[in-house]
Amino acid sequence: RERYDYELLKWTADRLKALREERGLSQETVYFHTNINIGRIEIGKSNISLTSLSILCKYFGISIEDFSKGISTEQAG
């Protein structure tokens, strides 16, 4: 059994990148404020933890629930 759901990781990476770019933020700025290397997440080099996702959602001013809108049932499991 695979340990990673690559489609879900890609969706998450794309969603985080879109949120960052919509706010006009660089990867460096996000790292400075959160201590999370969002660049590694965006290119699929890092599996994001729930804690990191929560921190990033708070930083971007959205709830995890709003962040996850658009995930299909197939992507989520």
State the predicted function of each range.
Residues E22-R40:
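Short alpha-helical DNA-recognition segment
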